[in-house]
């Protein structure tokens, strides 16, 4: 008799995606982060739902409702910090996942790569709106500063900002709509994830060698289910260490002060996962130029497949490209550090240098080095 998982309409889809899926036999732990991102999304949706049960999206009570969750709701503080630090884990896995795609040439699967970029943008938008909801000082001023960037758009900028705000400043209307979008977007992300997987399973996964693996496949279960489970346990260990021992390590102390439109915090800065883009934004003295650089810093991922000049797909056997990749990683770490520093000498100069290096590496240096490697290998 045929196993039910192979004939039942719903189970068949699950079976072909997670059980009998033919997977390359040599994919390393860098391929674990896709499943970890799925786990992060599940954690965020579940904890977010329980937070939404107790939260009120009103300027007068938002801060108090978050305080009430932490003080009075049974295990409320755990749920709140799981959600806040879960976002950090989400972005950590996202950055590693994208980095792995760049290193091993996964961008040669264009549909999967482009859906991934749309997912990155959507997750960033969701996280930004979520940061506004506790209605602390950094929530309010972060929302004001970031939404105000749209006023740099010629002609329609000011009208657009007021339309997003729902008034002439960040207020009750802004908070209500941000809560509505923050609630609905994770479900849109879940739908995009399914499309991402659909396109991935059309072609099959890439592997560390970057070569065709049709001749050497193994079933996803039990080999990679066990491997993913180990990754999940390590992720949960890191997340629970943060939640139970250092819950405020990645947060901002200013967000424990209720939002006050009359008092600007000394240093307005976003969460750590946006600091690299914030540093690029601040490195350009012109407002419109800064906004364009900010958007381009993420959108540049879309043209990476066109900038791929190497004859080999993966960087596994390309030591010069590897060095450039790790310089890019170090540069992004530098930008993240600079984003959290005040706008003064020498941080301005370091930020500008790191921003120029970021764009130069992706647009000029890495493609040129790849061409050099082709010559060296006589390809």
From Swiss-Prot:
GO terms for molecular function: metal ion binding; ubiquinol-cytochrome-c reductase activity. Its main location: mitochondrion. The cytochrome bc1 complex contains 11 subunits: 3 respiratory subunits (MT-CYB, CYC1 and UQCRFS1), 2 core proteins (UQCRC1 and UQCRC2) and 6 low-molecular weight proteins (UQCRH/QCR6, UQCRB/QCR7, UQCRQ/QCR8, UQCR10/QCR9, UQCR11/QCR10 and a cleavage product of UQCRFS1). This cytochrome bc1 complex then forms a dimer. It is a multi-pass membrane protein. It is found in: Mitochondrion inner membrane. Gene3D superfamilies: Cytochrome Bc1 Complex, Chain C. One of its GO terms (biological process) is mitochondrial electron transport, ubiquinol to cytochrome c. The chain crosses the membrane at residues 33-53, 77-98, 113-133, 178-198, 226-246, 288-308, 320-340, 347-367. The keyword Mitochondrion applies. Heme 1 (or BL or b562) is low-potential and absorbs at about 562 nm, and heme 2 (or BH or b566) is high-potential and absorbs at about 566 nm. Keywords: Electron transport, Heme, Iron, Membrane, Metal-binding, Mitochondrion, Mitochondrion inner membrane, Respiratory chain, Transmembrane, Transmembrane helix, Transport, Ubiquinone. This is Cytochrome b. Heme b b566 binds at residues 97, 196. Component of the ubiquinol-cytochrome c reductase complex (complex III or cytochrome b-c1 complex) that is part of the mitochondrial respiratory chain. The b-c1 complex mediates electron transfer from ubiquinol to cytochrome c. Contributes to the generation of a proton gradient across the mitochondrial membrane that is then used for ATP synthesis. A ubiquinone binds at residue 201. GO terms for cellular component: mitochondrial inner membrane; respiratory chain complex III. Pfam families: Cytochrom_B_C, Cytochrome_B. Its cofactor is heme b. It comes from Allocebus trichotis. Heme b b562 binds at residues 83, 182. PROSITE patterns: CYTB_CTER (PS51003), CYTB_NTER (PS51002).
């Amino acid at each position: 008799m045929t196993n039910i998982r192979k004939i039942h309409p719903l189970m068949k889809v699950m079976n072909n995606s997670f059980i009998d899926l033919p997977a390359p036999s040599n994919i390393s732990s860098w391929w674990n982060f896709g499943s970890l991102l799925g786990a992060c999304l599940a954690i965020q949706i579940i904890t977010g739902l329980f937070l939404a049960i107790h939260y009120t999206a009103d300027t007068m009570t938002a801060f108090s409702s978050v305080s009430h969750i932490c003080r009075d709701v049974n295990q409320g503080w755990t749920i709140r910090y799981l959600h806040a630090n879960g976002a950090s884990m989400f972005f950590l896995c996202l950055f590693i996942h994208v980095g792995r795609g760049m290193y091993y040439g996964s961008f040669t699967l264009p549909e999967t790569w482009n859906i991934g970029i749309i997912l990155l943008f959507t997750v960033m938008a969701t996280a930004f709106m979520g940061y506004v909801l506790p209605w602390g000082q950094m929530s309010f001023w972060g929302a004001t500063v970031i939404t105000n960037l749209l006023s740099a758009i010629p002609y329609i900028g000011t009208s657009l900002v007021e339309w997003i705000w729902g008034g002439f400043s960040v207020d009750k209307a802004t908070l209500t709509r941000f809560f509505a979008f923050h609630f609905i977007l994770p479900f849109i992300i879940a739908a995009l994830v399914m499309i991402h997987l659909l396109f991935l399973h059309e072609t099959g996964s890439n592997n560390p060698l970057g070569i065709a693996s049709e001749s050497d496949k193994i079933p996803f279960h039990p080999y990679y289910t066990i491997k993913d489970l180990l990754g999940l346990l390590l992720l949960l260990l890191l997340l629970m260490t943060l939640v139970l021992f250092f819950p405020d390590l990645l947060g901002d102390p200013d967000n424990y002060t209720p939002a006050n439109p009359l008092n600007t915090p000394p240093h307005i800065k976003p969460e750590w996962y946006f600091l690299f883009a914030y540093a690029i934004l601040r490195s350009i003295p012109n407002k419109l130029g800064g906004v364009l650089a900010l958007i381009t810093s993420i959108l540049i991922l879309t043209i990476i497949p066109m900038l791929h000049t190497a004859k080999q797909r993966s960087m596994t056997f390309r030591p010069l490209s590897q060095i450039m990749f790790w310089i890019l990683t170090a540069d992004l770490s530098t930008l993240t550090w600079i984003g959290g520093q005040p706008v003064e000498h020498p941080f301005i100069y370091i930020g500008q240098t790191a921003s120029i290096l970021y764009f130069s590496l992706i647009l000029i240096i890495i493609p040129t080095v790849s061409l050099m490697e082709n010559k060296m290998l006589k390809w």
